[in-house]
Swiss-Prot record:
This is DELTA-alicitoxin-Pse1a. It comes from Phyllodiscus semoni (Night anemone). GO terms for cellular component: extracellular region; nematocyst; other organism cell membrane; pore complex. It comes from the Eukaryota. Composed of a long N-terminal alpha-helix and a core region rich in beta-sheet structures. Before the pore formation, the alpha-helix binds the lipid membrane, partitions into the lipid-water interface and stabilizes the monomeric molecule on the membrane. Finally, it traverses the bilayer, thus forming the transmembrane pore. Residues 58-77 are annotated as: N-terminal region. Residues 152-167 are annotated as: Trp-rich region, which is important for the binding to lipid membrane. Pore-forming protein that forms cations-selective hydrophilic pores of around 1 nm and causes cytolysis. Pore formation is a multi-step process that involves specific recognition of membrane sphingomyelin (but neither cholesterol nor phosphatidylcholine) using aromatic rich region and adjacent phosphocholine (POC) binding site, firm binding to the membrane (mainly driven by hydrophobic interactions) accompanied by the transfer of the N-terminal region to the lipid-water interface and finally pore formation after oligomerization of monomers. Octamer or nonamer in membranes. Monomer in the soluble state.
Amino acid sequence: MRHFVVFLYMFLALSIPTAFAKKHIVTKKGNHQDITNDNEGENAEKKSAAVAGAVIAGGELALKILTKILDEIGKIDRKIAIGVDNESGLKWTALNTYYKSGASDVTLPYEVENSKALLYTARKSKGPVARGAVGVLAYKMSSGNTLAVMFSVPFDYNLYTNWWNVKIYDGEKKADEKMYNELYNNNNPIKPSIWEKRDLGQDGLKLRGFMTSNGDAKLVIHIEKS
């Protein structure tokens, strides 16, 4: 009897872990075996995809995603989350960002394929400074031209308001103070709180976009074929 009990104990000790392990093997494709405990890994990946400095599917871009990104920046008086959807039929490659004031804690996404959207954030400089989050970012398109996006979240709303703008420049052109001044002062900058539609006049493209009016600003832009 004692030998039987020992045998039964050893049998159970070996078989139970094996039975649990088999539940983790979900599918087998070719020479690759997909192993998972449950859906938590997949859900975590989906949740972490929509972060500043990332590229997501263009169809996923929405104001609620930008709100989530803003929350991750923390309590800063002036900040902005930017989402630009590439439906141009072209590939974009990052050039640079110029800041009139403020900074960013993330890197501008390097490549944005067609039907993808870039996510980016900016904020005022850290510390008790009366500055906003103001600048322009530039992407070279596979057409050879440059897409520029200007954003302005000022510190003093008694004198200024949120503004944004988009322009396509001939050839490759990095963002700088001259580009910023042109988009802010001379190229019909766009006011917040309204959906704007505009022909960009280059590469057969147009824009559709919206910017909120508060200090926790969200800017969503769709660049599309005309």
